[in-house]
């Protein structure tokens, strides 16, 4: 489990293409001492398993389904990736509960400055619109964000300077594809109401 509070922006330094898979290595400033082989790390919101590590790099294998359902198939060398290590007992629960199981790909519709902050409009696939509500939570590229307003399959978020600085959100432009994970509680409530 994760909280959507980004720990570092990793930088992809190598990608090895396999048969319907990729091996991705990224450099990070996270203290890797407590992270073991087999540990889970959220990479742009997608829970991946550490298969190799050095003092300052992590390596992950990415399968075909993950590449199909997320933006990971689009990644290239030098891409900046939001990283979050998994929760440990005693960690602060600062964002919201994030599983790292990406639901699909959302598209940035617009980015506008708003004083010291930025307003983003995000379009989600129609089947996920029912899980997005004002003042609810959503994870975009692994970042825990609060929904400001909703109109159909488009919703708005406001990005404060701190989030702008410590995540890869400043690289998002109109048309950027981003990983979407809807709030788990919203999903469960919708499921119960369907019965």
Positions of PLM-derived features:
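Conserved loop->alpha-helix
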Residues: 1-195
């Amino acid at each position: 489990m994760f909280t959507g509070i980004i720990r570092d922006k990793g930088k992809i330094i190598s990608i090895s293409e396999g048969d319907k898979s990729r091996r991705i290595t990224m450099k990070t400033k996270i203290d890797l001492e407590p992270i073991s082989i087999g540990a889970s790390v959220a990479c742009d919101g997608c829970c991946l398993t550490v298969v190799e590590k050095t003092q300052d790099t992590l390596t992950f294998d990415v399968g075909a389904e993950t590449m199909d359902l997320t933006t990971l198939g689009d990644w290239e060398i030098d891409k900046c990736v939001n990283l979050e290590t998994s929760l440990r007992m005693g960690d602060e629960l600062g964002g919201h509960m994030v599983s790292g199981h990406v639901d699909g790909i959302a598209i940035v519709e617009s980015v506008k400055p708003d004083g010291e902050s930025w307003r983003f409009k995000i379009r989600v696939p129609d089947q996920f619109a029912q899980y997005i509500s004002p003042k609810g939570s959503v994870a975009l590229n692994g970042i825990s964000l609060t929904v400001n307003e909703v109109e159909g399959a488009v919703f708005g978020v406001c990005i404060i300077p701190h989030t702008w600085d410590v995540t890869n959100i400043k690289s998002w432009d109109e048309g950027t594809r981003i990983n979407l994970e809807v709030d788990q509680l919203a999903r469960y409530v919708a499921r119960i109401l369907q019965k």
